[in-house]
C-alpha cells in the first residue's frame, strides 16, 4: 500500500492523484526533503528509505531534478500542511495505483514514473 494525495491543481483545473512531493528548501538535502514531505502530506514517518533514483522531467527547458524514494516501516504521526496546501491523503494498494496509471486516471508524470519504477523493482526482486 502506498500513500498518495489528491490535490486540486489550478494549472490543470482538476484534482489529481500524486505521490507526496515538494520543492527543496534552500540548501536542503533531497533525502531530508523526502522525509519532510511524507510527514507533512501523509502524516507518516518511516524506519527505512530507499532511493529509487532521480530523473529530469523537463530537459528541454528546465534544470528541475526529481528525486524518488520508497519509505517502509511506516508510523502514523500528524500532517503539517503549508498554509497554501489543500490536499487529501489516501492509502492505495500498489496494484490499484498501477491500474490507475494504466487506465489514465493518474496523470501526474512524477507519480507515473514513481509507481512504474517501484512496481518493476519489486517484480525483479530488487526491493
Where are the regions a protein language model picked out?
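Unchanged
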Residues: 23-109
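Short glycine-/acidic-enriched loop or helix-start segments at secondary-structure transitions
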Residues: 14, 80, 118
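Generic C-terminal helix-cap and adjacent flexible tail
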Residues: 120-127
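Conserved Nudix-box catalytic region and its N-terminal flanking loop in Nudix hydrolases
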Residues: 1-36, 127
Amino acid at each position: 500500500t502506498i500513500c498518495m494525495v489528491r490535490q486540486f491543481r489550478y494549472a490543470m483545473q482538476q484534482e489529481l492523484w500524486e505521490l507526496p512531493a515538494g520543492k527543496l528548501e534552500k540548501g536542503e538535502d533531497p533525502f531530508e526533503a523526502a522525509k519532510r514531505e511524507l510527514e507533512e502530506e501523509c502524516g507518516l514517518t518511516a524506519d527505512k528509505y530507499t532511493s529509487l533514483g532521480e530523473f529530469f522531467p523537463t530537459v528541454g527547458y528546465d534544470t528541475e531534478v526529481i528525486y524518488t524514494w520508497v519509505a517502509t516501516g511506516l508510523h502514523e504521526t500528524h500532517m503539517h500542511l503549508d498554509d497554501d496546501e489543500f490536499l487529501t491523503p489516501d492509502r492505495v494498494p500498489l496494484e490499484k495505483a498501477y491500474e490507475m496509471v494504466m487506465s489514465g486516471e493518474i496523470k501526474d508524470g512524477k507519480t507515473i514514473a514513481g509507481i512504474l519504477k517501484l512496481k518493476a523493482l519489486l517484480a525483479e526482486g530488487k526491493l
